[in-house]
Regions:
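C-terminal helical "lid" of AAA+/P-loop NTPase domains
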Residues: 252-256, 263-278
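Short regulatory helix/loop adjacent to the ATP-binding pocket of P-loop NTPases
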Residues: 203-218
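Short conserved motifs of the RecA-like P-loop NTPase core
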Residues: 180, 245-257
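Conserved small helical "lid"/interfacial subdomain of P-loop NTPases
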Residues: 223-250, 263, 268
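P-loop NTPase nucleotide-binding core
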Residues: 45-177, 191-194, 201-203
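Conserved catalytic/switch belt of AAA+ P-loop NTPases
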Residues: 179-190
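Winged-helix-like regulatory helical subdomains adjacent to P-loop NTPase cores
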Residues: 269-340
Length: 340
């Protein structure tokens, strides 16, 4: 990890900017995770309450996967200060990414495949048999396909553990229904392990089948678009890590263009730093660098943007107004709750 406010050479700065601004991949470390503290604490609260589980949902691009990624380091960090040493010793935090072809059993097999037992203690990660490890499913003598009761019995022996299923919106409806049954069962038996479901959805009902039957057993975490001050934290973090300074005008411009979506803050922030390097103006980043960044970001996604524009405006009717309507939407003053 680079020291705070360390000055880098221009070439190093252009390279290191990509370690702080990460538009292509979700954030995976707590020190680069900005905003969403309230939502993260809500997940931690669910972990600390037996029988309670969490569902993280919202539109695409608001940072759901990044939030899911920092659950593990946050929980493990809190363990250092928590009083429940027994749970902390046995706790594991495991994540998998669901696919459209996944069943209830295949998802849990993927989660359990990462866990081995050594001297009756769960350990996450690949290791050789020489270490005396025993795969979790082998230790419990459970065969595929796994049932709700199979999973319940295993989780009962992993107190305080967290199992995260990302992209849950992709699973078949039948799989979603079985997860609802599992959460209800875990709650009824007060099993002290937490299931966290993450997916793209406007409402929890679109993501979790028959959610009304488990409403008391789930903490519903809707990820709204980020507030301007939360997006500004991303830029503040970059300033400390890279030793650069965004002018107030540049920072406000980036935040406004991002429209609450952290992906764009990372994307424009990255190219702004590199634009400043090319202009020979680091560590100061001004509005001109932001405009150059927009040109570069647009250039890199030009073909996909053209394709989306073509699909949105195509019509067999000459009098269709799709193009001017789309242009009007683009130039209209954007507000957080604006229908546009």
């Amino acid at each position: 990890m680079a020291p705070m406010n360390q000055a880098f050479s221009p070439n190093d700065l252009a390279t290191r900017a990509a370690t702080v601004f990460q538009p292509r991949t979700p954030i995976a470390t707590r020190d680069l995770f900005a905003g969403r503290w309230d939502e993260l604490i809500t997940v931690a609260d669910a972990v600390n309450q037996p029988g309670l589980h969490a569902v993280i949902y919202g539109e695409r691009g608001v940072g759901k996967t990044s939030l899911a990624n920092v659950v593990k380091p946050t929980i493990l960090a809190l363990d250092e200060f928590g009083p429940d040493e027994a749970n902390a010793k046995l706790r594991v935090v495991v994540k998998t990414v669901a696919t459209s072809g996944d069943s209830f059993s295949s998802i849990w097999e993927n989660l359990f495949r990462d866990i081995n037992l050594i001297d009756d203690s769960p350990v996450v990660g690949f290791m050789s048999a020489a270490n005396g490890r025993v795969p979790l499913l082998e230790a419990y003598g459970v065969d595929s396909p796994l049932t709700v009761d199979d999973v319940r019995r295993i989780l009962s022996n992993l107190p305080g553990s967290v199992f995260i299923v990302d992209e849950f919106d992709r699973v078949p409806k039948e799989t979603s229904k079985t997860f609802t049954d599992l959460i209800k069962t875990l709650s009824d038996f007060s099993v002290n392990s937490t299931v966290v479901l993450v997916g793209v959805s406007d409402t929890i009902g679109q993501l979790v089948s028959d959610h009304a039957s488990i409403v008391r057993a789930i903490s519903q975490i809707f990820l709204r678009r980020m507030l301007p001050r939360e997006l500004k934290v991303i830029l503040d973090t970059a300033e400390k890590r890279l030793g650069v300074k965004f002018t107030d005008e540049a920072a406000q411009l980036i935040v406004h263009i991002s429209q609450g979506l952290p992906h764009y803050t990372h994307l424009i922030g990255l190219h702004s730093v590199r634009a400043a390097v090319r202009q020979g103006s680091p560590p100061n980043i001004d509005r001109n660098d932001v405009f150059k960044a927009l040109e570069e970001a647009t250039k890199q996604s030009e073909q996909s943007a053209r394709d989306r524009h073509s699909r949105a405006t195509h019509s067999s009717h000459k009098e269709a107004l799709y193009r001017p309507i789309l242009l009007a939407c683009a130039v209209a003053a954007a507000q957080q709750h604006d229908a546009l």
